Amino acid sequence: MDVFMKGLSKAKEGVVAAAEKTKQGVAEAAGKTKEGVLYVGSKTKEGVVHGVTTVAEKTKEQVTNVGGAVVTGVTAVAQKTVEGAGNIAAATGFVRKDHLGKSEEGAPQEGILEDMPVDPDNEAYEMPSEEGYQDYEPEA
């Protein structure tokens, strides 16, 4: 604990010196702050390396233990999202509720939403009449 206090004290001295002086104070503060950080780093290097290695190993173990549960959770969320999208499509009139079939696994059937018209501005599209079109024949 004394190591940390001594290092922080040196850093604090640097900050105080910077506040009292201008350009010279800033340079001195930088030097003392660096000195304090290096002091703490040199005294705790071995402990930090061991601690980081231990934390990394424990994290790896926990990720392995939780990994299966996360995959299951993501699958459930995706399923509920697809079901919700189908309900919204039916409620807005894009598809009829009787077209929202379910497969044997309970998942919506593929291709249900593929034929839905895309309308980003929420305006109805009308096809132009064929009278305004001319036949085009490319030149050879």
UniProtKB/Swiss-Prot annotation:
Main location: cytoplasm
Subunit annotation: Soluble monomer. Homotetramer. A dynamic intracellular population of tetramers and monomers coexists normally and the tetramer plays an essential role in maintaining homeostasis. Interacts with UCHL1. Interacts with phospholipase D and histones. Interacts (via N-terminus) with synphilin-1/SNCAIP; this interaction promotes formation of SNCA inclusions in the cytoplasm. Interacts with CALM1. Interacts with STXBP1; this interaction controls SNCA self-replicating aggregation. Interacts with SNARE components VAMP2 and SNAP25; these interactions allows SNARE complex assembly and integrity.
Post-translational modification: Phosphorylated, predominantly on serine residues. Phosphorylated on Tyr-125 upon osmotic stress.
Keyword Lipoprotein in record: no
Protein name: Alpha-synuclein
Region of interest (Interaction with SERF1A), ranges: 111-140
Gene Ontology MF term list: copper ion binding; cuprous ion binding; identical protein binding
One BP term from GO: synaptic vesicle endocytosis
Species per Swiss-Prot/TrEMBL record: Saguinus labiatus
